[in-house]
């Protein structure tokens, strides 16, 4: 690297530092005094279910006054308690209302009633990366790199706030109208200084240290980034099997095989991210995220232009106008039932 290039890189890293320091101030204000009860169920017209989970569903809704569309996440308090997800759910809302980044889905309103918790988020009509990846088969390396760069920046932002995301997978990445990523589902996100021990995540994406019940840190997100980049570029994840236990055996073995079409730069990056030895894993070394940002596979990436959303996206989802749900699957519709008695008031008092 020439002197001029080195100087440019140095000044870029300085301005990132300044940006993150300011971002932390903004985050901490909202983290310390979270917004509560900023809307009511009656203000929204419910249109269609976009997805379902073990303790709730996500619906497309329309704000009756403004006509704006949103994605409303509805969580059944009693089911959340039964599945021991109280802490995770409170984390999700507290974190989402405090963060602000171009590739994180925005929480617009949150409220609760006798039966449910509600998180009303920006509606991202392009659907999940998962469905586009399965349809296309695999992404070209430049296509995968465009998405990967956004995740790198997002993790750099989250980690600077002491947040671990813990749930990276194509199902949690939505594609917006400009073809950029919106990370959704902060159900497993957590603010941690140092290490944590909870077993959570998706089998294919779990880092070895989580499987081995060791204390772990934000390096688990960089491992998951390696899994995601592999899956985007190959069309299948690096470790897969019929049963979770078999997947776990492959993950902790430290062996990974690459398709012959992977470039040597991509293989090199992945060996450094899918690195079982934490003292060698990229993102977890003394240079932090810069080992990843300065890697040869990302040589063509203009990080500032990605952040500013100035890079032309490789793929724009089909979009037929506001409220279009054609990029989402169909689900059986169900009435939202609200009890006349308050359920689990104590458990969710801070929501």
Curated annotation (Swiss-Prot):
Active-site residues from the entry: 167
Activity control note: Allosterically activated by various compounds, including ATP. Activated by cAMP; the nucleotide acts as a dynamic and allosteric activator by coupling the two lobes of apo PKA, enhancing the enzyme dynamics synchronously and priming it for catalysis.
Modifications after synthesis and translation: Autophosphorylated. Phosphorylation is enhanced by vitamin K(2). Phosphorylated on threonine and serine residues. Phosphorylation on Thr-198 is required for full activity. Phosphorylated at Tyr-331 by activated receptor tyrosine kinases EGFR and PDGFR; this increases catalytic efficiency.
Modified residues (Phosphoserine): 11, 140, 339
Major place of residence: cytoplasm
Bilayer-spanning residue ranges: none
Keyword field contains Hydrolase: no
EC numbers on record: 2.7.11.11
Effect of residue 205 to A: Loss of allosteric regulation
Keywords: ATP-binding, cAMP, Cell membrane, Cell projection, Cilium, Cushing syndrome, Cytoplasm, Cytoplasmic vesicle, Disease variant, Flagellum, Kinase, Lipoprotein, Membrane, Mitochondrion, Myristate, Nucleotide-binding, Nucleus, Phosphoprotein, Serine/threonine-protein kinase, Transferase
Reaction equations catalysed: L-seryl-[protein] + ATP = O-phospho-L-seryl-[protein] + ADP + H(+); L-threonyl-[protein] + ATP = O-phospho-L-threonyl-[protein] + ADP + H(+)
Pfam families registered for this protein in UniProt: Pkinase (PF00069)
Single Gene Ontology BP annotation: signal transduction
Compartments (UniProt record): Cytoplasm; Cell membrane; Membrane; Nucleus
GO CC annotation: acrosomal vesicle; calcium channel complex; cAMP-dependent protein kinase complex; centrosome; ciliary base; cytoplasm; cytosol; extracellular exosome
CDD domains, alphabetized: STKc_PKA
Result of altering residue 202 to A: No phosphorylation
Domain Protein kinase: 44-298
Effect of residue 206 to R: In PPNAD4; somatic mutation; the mutation results in cAMP-independent basal protein kinase activity and constitutive activation of protein kinase A
Keyword Nucleotide-binding: yes
Resulting phenotype, residue 201 to A: No phosphorylation
Quaternary organization: A number of inactive tetrameric holoenzymes are produced by the combination of homo- or heterodimers of the different regulatory subunits associated with two catalytic subunits. cAMP causes the dissociation of the inactive holoenzyme into a dimer of regulatory subunits bound to four cAMP and two free monomeric catalytic subunits. The cAMP-dependent protein kinase catalytic subunit binds PJA2. Both isoforms 1 and 2 forms activate cAMP-sensitive PKAI and PKAII holoenzymes by interacting with regulatory subunit (R) of PKA, PRKAR1A/PKR1 and PRKAR2A/PKR2, respectively.
Family: Belongs to the protein kinase superfamily. AGC Ser/Thr protein kinase family. cAMP subfamily.
Protein name as annotated: cAMP-dependent protein kinase catalytic subunit alpha
Species in which this protein is naturally found: Homo sapiens
Gene name of this polypeptide: PRKACA
């Amino acid at each position: 690297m020439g002197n001029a290039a080195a100087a440019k890189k140095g000044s870029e890293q300085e301005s990132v530092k300044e940006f993150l320091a300011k971002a932390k101030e903004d985050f901490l204000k909202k983290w310390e005094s979270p917004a509560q009860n900023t809307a009511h169920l009656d203000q929204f017209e419910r249109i269609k279910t976009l997805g379902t989970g073990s303790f709730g569903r996500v619906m497309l809704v329309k704000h009756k006054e403004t006509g704006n569309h949103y994605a409303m996440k509805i969580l059944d308090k009693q089911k959340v308690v039964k599945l021991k997800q109280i802490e995770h759910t409170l984390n999700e809302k507290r974190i989402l209302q405090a963060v602000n980044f171009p590739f994180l889905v925005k929480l617009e309103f949150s409220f609760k009633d006798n039966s449910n918790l509600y998180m009303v988020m920006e509606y991202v009509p392009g659907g999940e990366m998962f469905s586009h990846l399965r349809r296309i088969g695999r992404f070209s390396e430049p296509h995968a790199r465009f998405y990967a760069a956004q995740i790198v920046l997002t993790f750099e932002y989250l980690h600077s706030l002491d947040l671990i995301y813990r749930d990276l997978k194509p199902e949690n990445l939505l594609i917006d109208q400009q073809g950029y990523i919106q990370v959704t589902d902060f159900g497993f996100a957590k603010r941690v200084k140092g290490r944590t021990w909870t077993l959570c995540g998706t089998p294919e994406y779990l880092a070895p240290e989580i499987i081995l019940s060791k204390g772990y840190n934000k390096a688990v997100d960089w491992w998951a980034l390696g899994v995601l980049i592999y899956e985007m570029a190959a069309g299948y994840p690096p470790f897969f099997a019929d049963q979770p236990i078999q997947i776990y055996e492959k993950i902790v073995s430290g062996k990974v095989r690459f398709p012959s079409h992977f470039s040597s730069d991509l293989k090199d990056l992945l060996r450094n991210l899918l690195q079982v030895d934490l003292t060698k894993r990229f993102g977890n070394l003394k240079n932090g995220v810069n080992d990843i940002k300065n890697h040869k596979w990302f040589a063509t990436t203009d990080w500032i232009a990605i952040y500013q959303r100035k890079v032309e996206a490789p793929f724009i989802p089909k979009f037929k106008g506001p409220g279009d749900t054609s990029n989402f699957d169909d689900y059986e519709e169900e009435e939202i039932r609200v009890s006349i008695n308050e359920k689990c008031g104590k458990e969710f008092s801070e929501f």
